[in-house]
Amino acid sequence: MGRAGGRSSYGVCEFALSWHILDGYAAATDLSGLMAVMAGRYDDDEPGSPWRVALYLDERADSTQRQALTRIFLGQLGGTPFRNFASAIGEVYAVRAARIELDHRPDAQRIDAGTYVSVRAAEAIDADGPVSCGIPGHDHPGTEVRTEHLRVDEPPMRWDVSGRCGFATDFGYRSDEA
């Protein structure tokens, strides 16, 4: 599915991932309608390329929902998130509640997580065949986009870049727990 992942374009990958849970549960805890954003970075030349991240959880979530979202997106429940990306997380700088606004519509993609993360996609990139992100285990083809801007302000992570590549797709996550 898609092109195989390889080295990041700049040797250091600075990223923001976002999720809008359309329909989801963690055990009996309803997570439908909630959102999460993860900002992070990794260095291709560092052994194992561990991710250093911050996780932002929808401020509308109650404490039980926040705990479930944290466990899911940091890979503590195993399953698809752990196999797709969370196993690469080496350090977590912060887990915070934030006002999250997402737009995942084609040609309108944007991510806002409080004052910590802001991303705007400028346009889709024409590709020959399906495109998949270099996230380990990623299994859904999607669309490559060029970013208008990607800004993260979560010490020690701080960057504001433009014209970088981005990736948009859907996800279907399941834990290893019943």
Kindly label every feature range from the protein language model.
Residues 1-21:
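N-terminal ordered "arm"
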Residues 2, 39-43, 98-102:
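Short amphipathic beta-strand and strand-loop transition segments with alternating hydrophobic
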Residues 9-11, 47, 103:
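A generic structural signal for short, solvent-exposed coil/turn residues
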Residues 17-71:
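Long, charge-rich boundary regions
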Residues 22-27, 50, 85-90, 140-143:
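Short C-terminal domain-edge/linker segments immediately following a structured domain
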Residues 29, 90-95, 145-151:
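Low-complexity, flexible helical/coil segments
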Residues 117-178:
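Extended, charged low-complexity segments
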